[in-house]
């Protein structure tokens, strides 16, 4: 017997935040930054429906918006991503990612942490986090689409790392492997 899970919502604001977060992802993936920004403002006005998980995802999407709009301050974004991770992980340990049970939002936050570390010149952290995420995703049960999307996002950051360390051949091979999965 196959059962499909459907979310339940305690209030209308809870539903509105959930739905708006999905819309923001759609707009960001379509590079429609103005409606994404407007929806993020709307979610903030709803006070994230008093839900720390919505707030954490909102912070992630806010960072994505800043990066895609070209307005990102990488030091600030790095700290914002660390803050977002601390909402559910009070003690962040990049060395122990493989031993954690992470949500897809937390995985994305770790990927963004690696990317921001790379932009700040911390190639060792970027390399380590990307490797941890890659092995983590290979060993966890996720839907094929979700795993492929997260692996592709991680591959983008790892490719940037490889380009930074001038390993062009590996960067080409990795980008070619994942170029159709985003």
List each language-model region with its residue ranges.
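Flexible helix-coil transition and linker loops at the boundaries of alpha-helical arrays
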Residues: 9-10, 45-55, 86-103, 136-148, ...
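Short intrinsically disordered, low-complexity segments
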Residues: 130, 143, 156, 180-181
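Basic, Lys/Arg-rich alpha-helical nucleic-acid-recognition elements, primarily the DNA-binding modules
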Residues: 1-14
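Internal amphipathic alpha-helical repeat/solenoid segments
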Residues: 2-5, 37-49
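Helix-turn-helix repeat elements of alpha-solenoid scaffolds
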Residues: 27-43, 69-94, 120-139, 164-179
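Short acidic alpha-helical/loop segments enriched in Asp/Glu that coordinate divalent cations
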Residues: 144-149, 169-173
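Tandem amphipathic alpha-helical repeat scaffolds
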Residues: 19-31, 59-72, 105-122, 150-166
């Amino acid at each position: 017997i196959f059962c499909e899970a459907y979310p339940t919502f305690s209030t209308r604001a809870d539903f509105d935040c959930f739905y708006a977060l999905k819309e923001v992802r759609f707009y960001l993936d379509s590079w429609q930054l103005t409606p994404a920004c407007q929806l993020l403002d709307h979610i903030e006005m709803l006070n994230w429906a008093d839900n720390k998980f919505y707030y954490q995802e909102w912070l992630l999407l806010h960072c994505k918006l800043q990066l895609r709009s070209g307005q990102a301050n990488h030091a600030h974004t790095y700290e914002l991503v660390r803050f977002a991770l601390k909402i559910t992980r009070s003690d962040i340990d990049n060395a122990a990612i493989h031993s954690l049970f992470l949500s897809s939002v937390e995985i994305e936050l770790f990927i963004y942490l690696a990317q921001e570390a790379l932009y700040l010149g911390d190639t060792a952290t970027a390399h380590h986090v990307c490797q941890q995420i890659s092995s983590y995703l290979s060993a966890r049960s996720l839907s094929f689409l979700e795993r492929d999307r997260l692996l592709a996002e991680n591959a983008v950051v790892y490719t940037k790392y490889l380009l930074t360390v001038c390993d062009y051949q590996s960067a080409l091979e990795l980008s070619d492997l994942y170029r159709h999965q985003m």
